[in-house]
C-alpha cells in the first residue's frame, strides 16, 4: 500500500481531482467521494475552508492541517485528516474543532485485515514524519478504529454517553414498543395542544431528496429562526450566546455549513406558526441512520413536550418515506431520549503513540 501526504486540503483536493498520471492516488477521487457519502464525517474535514477555520486563523489559533491517504490498486483504503500541534510532534484527528460529534479516520468498505494493514502503514508514515501521537476525540467505541487499537497500547482519558433510537421494525412496531410513559406523555401533549386550539405542523427538509428541499430564501429564513432557538438554548444551559457564538453557530460550524450540502436534514415542529422544536443533522446511508447532533426546543412551548413529539413524528415519517431506520441523537443521555426507546453507546477520547521520537 502507498501512503500519500497532503499538507493542505486544497492540495489534497487538487490531486484527488486529477485523472491519469501520478499513480493510483490521482485516480481515487471518485472512491474518496464514495467514502465521503458513506461516512458523513468527511463533510467537516473536506469543507474546512469555511468561516470557523478562517476565524481561527484570524485569532491566531490556527493549527497546521495534514491529510494522509492510504491507497492500493483499487483506490483509497484509509483517509486520516489531522490537526498538528505547533511543534508538529502531536496530532488530533480533525473534526471536534467544528463541533463534530463523531471523529475517526475514514475507511473504505474492506475486510479488517486490509484495514489493519492500511492503519499500520499510516502510523508508520506518521512516525517517519516525526509525529509521536494521535488523539481521537469522540471516537465511537466498538468501531473499526477501536477494533484495530486492541492490538496496540493506547490510553482512554474520558468517555461520553450517546443515545440512538432505532425503529427497524417500522412505524407500527416503533409505536408498539414505546415505553408506556412515552406514549402517555405524547398523548397528553397532543390533547393539550388540541384542547387549547393550537395549530401544529411538522416539516421535514433535506438536500438528499427526502421531504422538501433546503435551497432558496424560505428554507434559509426557517434555518435562521431554528438556529436562534438553538442559540437561546445554549445560552440558558451553558451561558454561551454572545455575538461571537451567534456568528459561529449561524455561519461557522459544520452543521450550518452543510446546508445546502450533500446529506443535511432538518426537521421542524411549529406551534401557531412559531418554531417550537427542531433538529438538524446528516443522513448516513451507510448506517441507514439520521445523525442528529443538534436538537433544541423553545422553552415557551415546553409544556407541550415538543422535542419528544418531533423525534417520534420524525421516526414515523422516516419509516414511511425512506430506508432510514435509526435516529442517532448523539452526545447526551437525557431522560427524554431514553424514554423514546433509545439505547446507550459510548464515544471516547483515545490517545495512541506512533512510536516516533518525542
PLM features: what roles do these ranges have?
Residues 159-162, 166-180:
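Active-site-proximal, glycine-rich beta->alpha crossover segments in alpha/beta enzymes
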Residues 85-157, 285-344:
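Acyl-donor binding region in acyl/amide transferases
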Residues 157-165, 344-355:
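Conserved catalytic-core motifs of GNAT/GCN5-like acyltransferases
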Residues 78, 101, 159-161, 265, ...:
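Residues that flank catalytic or metal-binding motifs in active/ligand-binding sites
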Residues 131, 197-199, 264, 324, ...:
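Short secondary-structure junction motifs
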Residues 4-91, 139-146, 150-157, 176-303:
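A conserved beta-strand-loop-helix scaffold within acyl/acetyltransferase catalytic domains
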Residues 107-110, 165-167, 206:
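Short beta-strand-to-loop capping motifs
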